[in-house]
Amino acid sequence: MSRVYVGNLDPRVTERELEDEFRSFGVIRSVWVARRPPGYAFLDFEDSRDARDAIREVDGKNGWRVEQSHNRGGGGGRGGGRGGGDGGRGRGGSDLKCYECGESGHFARECRSRGGSGGRRRSRSRSRSPPRYRKSPTYGGRRSYSPRARSPPPPRRRSPSPRGRNYSRSPPPYRARDEVPYANGNGLKDVRRSRS
């Protein structure tokens, strides 16, 4: 499989239009049109000879720049196809050089040396975001446990109340002791006088 880079595209160009333009040269496996930023695309030809024919015939047509994009390391995946641009060296594509690797034929967002296509980075950021949401319930759970930790103080509040009851119960026995030995009111007065 051979990947072809197409630059200087009109932002309104669709994948179907590109496929119709290049279909006559051979079997196209996939077509990818950039949207952010627009203006370029990649086509995967099943046969590298078909890709070379397409580059020869279409390069310069409609103002397009058509170059071959080589996979680094001998064809390791779709993301790698966007990383190369060896064919662009001979064409002087200095205005389309990648800021990451210095090669022409692709942008920094599509450079393999940067860690793959931009889509992969977005997927990583999405994968990182769910753990943040997963952590929040744990914090919420800890907060929910804190009221349970505060629940023991109510028994402590109950403990003073029996003491208060003891104090309320204790005075009647003292009064009973004073009143029991002396049935008459005079006896109580005599005791108080004798104590005085």
UniProtKB/Swiss-Prot annotation:
Q: What is this protein called?
A: Serine/arginine-rich splicing factor RSZ22A
> What is the similarity comment for this entry?
Belongs to the splicing factor SR family. RSZ subfamily.
Q: Where is the signal peptide?
A: none
> Per UniProt, which keywords does this protein have?
Metal-binding, mRNA processing, mRNA splicing, Nucleus, Phosphoprotein, Spliceosome, Zinc, Zinc-finger
Q: Extract the PROSITE patterns matched here.
A: RRM (PS50102), ZF_CCHC (PS50158)
Residue ranges annotated as compositionally biased, kind Gly residues, are 72-87
Q: What is the protein's known function?
A: Probably involved in intron recognition and spliceosome assembly.
Q: Name one GO biological process term.
A: RNA splicing
Q: Does the keyword Zinc apply?
A: yes
Q: Which residues does the UniProt record annotate as the domain RRM?
A: 2-71
Which Gene3D superfamilies does this entry report, sorted A to Z?
A: 3.30.70.330, Zinc finger, CCHC-type
